[in-house]
Design a protein with these regions (language model features):
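Proline-aspartate-enriched helix->loop->beta-strand connector
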Residues: 106, 110-123
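Metal-dependent phosphoester-hydrolase catalytic domains
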Residues: 2-60, 119, 222-223, 233, ...
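Residue-level marker for buried hydrophobic side chains located in beta-strands
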Residues: 75-76, 250
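Short catalytic/ligand-binding loop motif for oxyanion handling, primarily in non-cytosolic enzymes
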Residues: 83-86, 129-133, 151-155, 164, ...
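Structured beta-strand-rich core segments of catalytic domains in phosphoester-bond hydrolases
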Residues: 4, 17-72, 120-217, 306, ...
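Generic structural signal for small/hydrophobic residues in well-ordered secondary structure
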Residues: 78-79, 109, 113, 168, ...
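Acidic/histidine-rich helix-loop elements
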Residues: 80-103, 153-154, 187-188, 219-227
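Active-site metal-binding loops of divalent metal-dependent hydrolases
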Residues: 80, 126, 216, 253-254, ...
């Protein structure tokens, strides 16, 4: 989404989530039951199938990593649809208005995240960060957030402040080493898009991992295509500035189909070498869509969201599998968002294995004293 800078900013309606009180000390099952309680009279979340990585990747994993006790983790990537945009800008003509109510949507978003039990959560269009920080915090996550410098949300009625990118990690699995944020630049000029980068240490293996999440410029046209590509170049420079040879994941809503230049920029670079997790589990092909919506100007479906990972050398991650996107027949004629799907984008859920640390051989020096 672009900026509505010709309009005056509207004071945010903060405090809309103050009455949400997540239960302390609940097990994951009990907590999920609490999340689902307000949704009891609504259709459930959409069914999805898990797709394992092809046999060669699994064979490589078993021979190279599993024997060394490689650590595995799950990552969830999702543009959750900013509430202000969903209700006052995006014109989802086939979505029941009640399905866009925040009182319903917030619990459906939480349900989607917690059902898949990710170790790392990367979100875009987050305009209720404090709620997710509080709710996910009760379940053992810590998070970070960077807002867009000129979010379109702040020009819309009933907004809750600017939207931006958020990243959460499970503290029983990872420790935060460092974090950085950046306003992406286009030809050395700051844009309205941001990136959030964290380095995490996996507690069991002590292996470090860099994760970067972003949301690139939207809309069609030759100029916008070029702007996205420049943002992609800046993104890679930002990553290499802080990665220091670690395994890395770059994920987000890139607002670009695989045929766009920015996709090639991200996946054909050698600094670092990145592959798409979903293409890996789909025999080299990206899914046909990661968003499917009907607005006032018509129906559109595109593949815009990606999870990219380092695929070479000592920083190579192993993809174990990923969750397929919802099928057309399950989406129904209204597509997304809906009562079952709280966003116009679908979450991407991927399982990875970290490469083991290469430690120097242990040498015992002979003691020649007294000889």
């Amino acid at each position: 989404m672009g900026s509505f800078t010709s309009r005056p900013q509207i004071t945010s309606c903060s405090g809309t989530d103050d009455k949400v009180e997540p239960p302390e000390g609940a097990s994951p099952e009990q907590f999920l039951e609490w999340v689902r309680r307000p949704l009891a009279d609504l259709p459930g979340i959409l069914p999805r199938e898990y797709r394992r990585a092809p046999a060669p990747s699994l064979a490589t994993l078993h021979t190279a990593s599993a024997a060394a006790g490689a650590a595995t983790f799950r990552l969830l990537q999702w543009n959750i649809l900013a509430q202000a945009l969903g209700t006052h800008a995006d014109n989802f003509v086939k979505c029941p208005p009640e399905a866009l109510h925040w009182s319903t949507r917030r619990f459906r978003i939480m349900e989607e995240i917690l059902t898949h039990s990710p170790d790392i959560v990367c979100l875009q269009e987050v305009d209720h960060y404090s709620l997710f920080e509080r709710v996910l915090g009760v379940q053992g996550y810590e998070g970070l957030f960077i807002p867009k410098p000129d979010s379109p949300c702040i020009y819309l009625p009933e907004n809750s402040g600017p939207d931006g990118c958020a990243l959460f990690y499970r503290t029983s699995k990872f420790q935060l080493v460092e974090h950085h944020s950046r306003i992406l630049e286009i030809w050395r000029v700051q844009s309205n898009q941001v990136a959030l980068l964290v380095t995490l240490r996996e507690l069991q293996s002590q292996r470090e991992l860099t994760v970067l999440t972003t949301h690139l410029k939207a809309r069609k046209g030759a100029l916008l295509t070029s702007l996205r590509n420049e943002q992609g170049k800046d993104l890679l420079q930002f990553l290499e500035q802080h990665r220091h040879g670690r395994p890395a994941i770059v994920c987000g809503d890139m607002n670009a189909e695989p045929v766009e230049p920015v996709y090639a920029t991200l996946t054909q670079s050698h600094q670092p070498s990145l592959s798409s997790a979903y293409a890996t589990v789909n025999d080299g092909h990206e899914p046909p869509y990661s968003t499917w919506k009907i607005r006032g100007d018509g129906e559109t479906k595109h593949n815009l969201d990606y999870v990219l990972y380092t695929d070479e050398g000592s920083s190579a991650l192993q993809v174990l599998g990923a969750l397929d996107h919802p099928k057309e027949e399950d989406l129904g004629p209204g597509r997304a968002p809906s009562f079952s799907c709280p966003s116009d984008h679908f979450s991407l859920v991927c399982d990875f294995a970290l490469p083991p640390l290469k430690r120097p051989p242990f040498h015992v020096e002979e003691d020649h004293r007294g000889r």
